[in-house]
Every structure is written in C-alpha cells, then in structure tokens.
C-alpha cells in the first residue's frame, strides 16, 4: 500500500473541534448499517472537502478505521490543499481499469486514516462513477473499514453527486451559512429524494459566530462554567468534552 504524508493539517479551534465531534457522534447514532457516507453541497466552495477531510480525521482519531474517497473527479482540490505529494494512482485509474484497489488506497501518517485520491480528470466522470467497478469499490471498502467517507461534486453543478449518493448508505448536505437560499437547498434535497438517496442531515458551514453574537456568548459562558473549575483544579478534561458534545447536540 502506498503511503503519503499529510503536511498541511489544519489547526482547529475548540468550537470547531467540538462541532466535528458532535457530527461524528451523530453519525454513530445512525446505526451500524450507515458506514458509507457521502458528502455533497449545493454549489462549489461551500467547504464540503474540508468537512469531509476533518470528519474522516475525527473518526480516525476516535479509533475508527476510516478511508476518505475523493470522488470529485472533475475538480479535486484534496491533494493540492493538504500537500500530500504525488500519489501514483487514484480513483479514476481504478474505475477505468488501469489500477487495482490496493494500488489506489494510500496509507497516511495519521493512524487509522487512509485516502483514495481522485486521480487525473477523466473524459467521462459520470459514466465511471456509475459503473460496476465503483459499486464493487464501495462494497470492498465496507468490508475493510469502519467508515467510508466520500467527497462528491456539488449537486447543483453536475449529476455525479447523486450517482455517488445512490451508492452510499446515507448523504450529508453541506450548506454555507448566508450563501445558499432555502429554495436552493430544498431543490438539492428534492434531487436526492428523486434519486432514491437517504439524506442523513445537513451541516451549516462557515458560520460567522461574531455576527451570531448571542450564540457565541452563550457558548463561551457555557464553556467556562462547565470547564472552569476543573481547569483550575488541573483535572483531566477529556470526559467533559464528550459530555459537552452530547449537550450541544441536544
């Protein structure tokens, strides 16, 4: 199995880390049958690749063997964004019969976290994602990993995301705050339903907590009241963090 080094790991603040822990926890409550999860968005640049990557990282950090599949065959940014180097094979190589699965799966320097990169842009992305090899790929990964996170193209641009979502156990829709209208989001939800996809929920991304001042102040107050005394006494905060994620979910 080839190995790549992830050189540009994002440093997340406390709120963001807790948000991913909450998302991770919510996914675990969907049940053991929901292991292949696709993530899509309405339009480009809503942050779906970052959410996919950080969610997969969070699952791996929790001890879950996780693989991130970059199925955005038209405009992938994963390798460039995280400066992983030059992998030899990717998803498009496998789907077109130019490589085997073991050639395309890359081990990373993060324990329990593997990646399948998109590979070079093919002339027929939709046809490749709709062929039997992609179905077989997900079935094989399901037998090997606890979670398979699939980053897909925006549904408002091309049909690829719906094709992948149909092969997944469930789909999460990423919505950029103050950018996507209710009508646009409903249109995407309708597309997923017509394609027979199961929508697990939505993630509101790029929220400006300074504008949402009331929530931000509440969170800071809650954080201090929950952790303040323990931090002063030097207690281990790992367990309260889990409890905080549960509380936030409510």
Question: Where in this protein do the model-derived segments appear?
Answer:
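Aromatic pocket-lining residues of Rossmann-like dinucleotide-binding sites
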Residues: 59
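P-loop/Walker-type NTP enzyme "switch/lid" segment
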Residues: 2-21, 25-32, 41-46, 53, ...
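Hydrophobic residues in beta-strands of the RecA-like P-loop NTPase core, especially within AAA+ ATPase
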Residues: 150-152, 204
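Inter-motif core of Ras-like GTPase G domains
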Residues: 143, 155-178
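Walker A (P-loop) ATP-phosphate-binding motif of ABC ATPase nucleotide-binding domains
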Residues: 36
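Hydrophobic micro-sites
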Residues: 1-6, 186-250
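Switch/connector loops and helix/strand junctions flanking conserved nucleotide-binding motifs
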Residues: 77-78, 124-126, 182-183, 209-214
């Amino acid at each position: 199995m080839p190995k790549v080094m992830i050189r540009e790991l994002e440093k997340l603040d406390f709120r963001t880390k807790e948000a991913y822990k909450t998302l991770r926890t919510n996914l675990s409550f969907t049940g053991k049958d929901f292991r292949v999860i696709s993530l899509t968005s309405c339009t480009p640049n809503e942050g779906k690749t970052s959410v996919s990557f950080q969610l997969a990282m969070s699952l791996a950090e929790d001890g879950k063997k996780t693989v991130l599949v970059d199925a955005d065959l038209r405009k992938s940014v994963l390798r460039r964004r995280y400066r992983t180097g030059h992998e030899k094979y990717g998803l498009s190589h496998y789907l077109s019969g130019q490589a085997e699965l073991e050639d395309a799966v890359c081990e990373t320097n993060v324990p329990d976290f593997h990646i399948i990169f998109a590979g070079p842009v093919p002339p027929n992305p939709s046809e490749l994602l709709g062929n039997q090899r992609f179905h077989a790929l997900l079935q094989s990964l399901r037998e090997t990993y606890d979670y398979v996170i699939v980053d897909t193209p925006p549904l408002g641009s091309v049909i690829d995301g719906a094709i992948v979502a149909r092969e997944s156990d469930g789909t999460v829709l990423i919505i950029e705050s103050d950018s996507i209208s209710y009508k646009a989001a409903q249109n995407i939800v309708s597309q997923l339903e017509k394609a027979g996809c199961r929508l697990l929920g939505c993630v509101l991304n790029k929220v400006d907590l300074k504008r949402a001042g009331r929530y931000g102040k509440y969170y800071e107050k809650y954080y201090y009241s929950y952790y303040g005394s323990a931090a002063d006494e030097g207690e281990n905060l790992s367990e309260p963090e889990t409890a905080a994620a549960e509380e936030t979910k409510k």
